[in-house]
Design a protein with these regions (language model features):
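N-terminal basic, amphipathic alpha-helical segments
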Residues: 1-136, 338, 342-348, 378, ...
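Active-site PLP attachment segment
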Residues: 70, 303-336, 351
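Conserved core of the PLP fold type I
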Residues: 140-278, 290-305, 468-469
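Conserved glycine-rich beta-strand-loop-beta hairpin in the small C-terminal domain of fold type I
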Residues: 374-384, 394-407
Length: 470
């Protein structure tokens, strides 16, 4: 029928649900077919009766099965008409490697147990204990759960953000902090305020695919600024400024996705000079600042928000489910962003913001961040060694943050390689997704927190051997 993997990150209940959904979707189990009894399935697959009960109940709730008293569980007729939200992921052959695919599949496809191409930390690296303690404290305090939040966000958290930024030499008050539903909403608000359809806009190349997709959706004309292992190609940037006269540059100077590179201090000063000379607004996406053990200066700390709009987030290190980000800007611009936030989606979630505030202030946050930084540094060393041992070229060795950018001379097409990897249950990050002008490339983004896994290297070694034998 199907096998269960007790070592998979997917819980056994989820594996059972997915297994039966697939059998029903491909007609291996036809409408009216009877499923194995609960005790029979539990005995044959080595799981508890309670696990099978929960899985069968989920399949009933989702419309795949029907339960008959004293008779058992049966495939429900018209189960193939189940809502799209619970549809079985498309076959491997149907996957399309572009930004839209990446945005959808990296989150939706639950059948890939290993995701070295993803952009978040593993569950056991996150601050879930802090979130649970915050939830319990909110319940114990009798926190009000109804009503809207404030337009700028929960005041106590805004004060905390301002105090945290002061430690990073960014001098702002709480009135200059706008809380958002993650950094994605912050970037979207800034883009919609600063850009019009047809406007040229500078972005890192390679860079953040979600941002590129969003900017294209707004009708902006994307111009890539080449990233190098040492930051930016400033000569190319100066030429692009002269040719296109853009007014906005969205960039991630620190621990950049996908390259992991960091902008040197000398480049930061030069970039600010160019921004001043060319009337350019710099939108600094600094969502990995908490992962930087050196706490290097940001553009915002050097500029004090004259030409820099600063975007941050707690989602990477608390939990992706805690969608709390923020944008910091000069007062007049921030007020306009707050108005735009209200027009487009009213307030952000006050409950989520209070939950984040509780997690950040319950006393263990700094210890958690140090643990994350240490684990990332260790993973960088091991993953870099494994990749270079297979013959991969590293774009750089940042030794911090989540990412390594690498390619192998015998694997020239990262998209084709990624297509093969899906068949082995592995989600890679093919380089063309991160390019302003997508084209075949051998570069791949590796999230070191997910790449310290023998299954990945067995797959890569096998693909290299196939190419060498061809």
């Amino acid at each position: 029928m199907f096998t269960l993997n007790p070592n998979s990150p997917m819980p056994l209940v989820g594996q059972i649900v997915d297994g039966f959904r697939r059998l029903i979707a491909d007609q291996s189990l036809k409408p009216g077919a009877k499923l194995p009894s609960i005790r029979g399935f539990a005995a044959s697959h080595g799981v508890s009766v309670f696990t099978v009960v929960e899985a069968y109940d989920r399949l009933v709730a989702q419309g795949w099965l029907t339960s008959r008293a004293n008779a058992g569980f049966f495939v429900k007729r018209r189960a193939t008409d189940a809502p799209a939200a619970i549809a079985v992921p498309r076959p491997v052959a149907d996957l399309r490697f572009n930004a839209q695919w990446y945005l959808k599949q990296i989150f939706e496809n639950r059948n890939l147990p290993l995701k070295p191409g993803c952009g978040w930390l593993p569950h056991d690296w996150l601050f879930e204990d802090g979130v649970r303690r915050s939830l319990r404290q909110m319940a114990a305090d009798g926190a009000e759960l109804g009503g809207y939040g404030l337009p700028h966000g929960h005041m106590a958290l805004r004060i905390l953000v301002a105090e945290s930024l002061a430690e990073h030499q960014i001098a702002v008050g709480a009135e200059q902090v706008l809380l958002t539903q993650g950094s994605s909403q912050a970037l979207d608000l800034v883009a919609r305020r600063l850009l019009k359809p047809g406007d040229p806009v500078l972005v890192d190349d390679p860079g953040y695919p979600n941002l590129m997709f969003m900017l294209r959706f707004l009708g902006a004309r994307l111009i890539g600024v080449p990233r190098t292992p040492a930051g930016y190609d400033l000569q190319a940037l100066e030429a692009l400024l002269a040719e296109h006269r853009p007014k906005v540059f969205f960039t991630q100077p620190r621990l950049q996705s996908p390259t992991g590179s960091v902008m040197p201090l000398a480049q930061a000063y030069r970039l600010l000079q160019l921004a001043e000379a060319n009337d350019l607004t710099l939108v600094e996406n600094d969502i990995c600042a908490d992962m930087d053990p050196e706490l290097r200066p940001s553009l915002a700390s050097l500029d004090q928000l004259r030409r820099v709009v600063y975007v941050g987030s707690f989602s990477k290190t608390i939990s992706p489910n805690i969608r709390v980000g923020y944008v910091v800007a000069r007062p007049d611009l921030l007020d306009e962003l707050a108005q735009l936030k209200m027009v487009s989606g009213l307030t952000s979630s006050d409950i989520t913001e209070r939950l984040a505030f509780g997690a950040l202030t319950e006393g263990r946050w700094r210890k958690h961040l140090k643990s994350v930084r240490d684990r990332l540094a260790d993973a960088h060393g091991r993953v870099a060694q494994r990749l270079t041992g297979l013959g991969f070229e590293l774009f750089g060795e940042p030794k911090a943050g989540m990412y390594l950018w690498a390619r192998h001379p015998d694997l020239p097409d990262g998209a084709e390689l990624s297509q093969q990897a899906v068949g082995d249950g592995i989600m890679l990050g093919p380089g063309q997704l991160f390019l302003v002008e997508p084209r075949p490339t051998g570069w791949l983004r590796f999230n070191v927190a997910f790449s310290d896994d023998e299954r990945l290297y067995r797959f890569l070694a096998a693909q290299i051997r196939l190419q060498e034998a061809a």
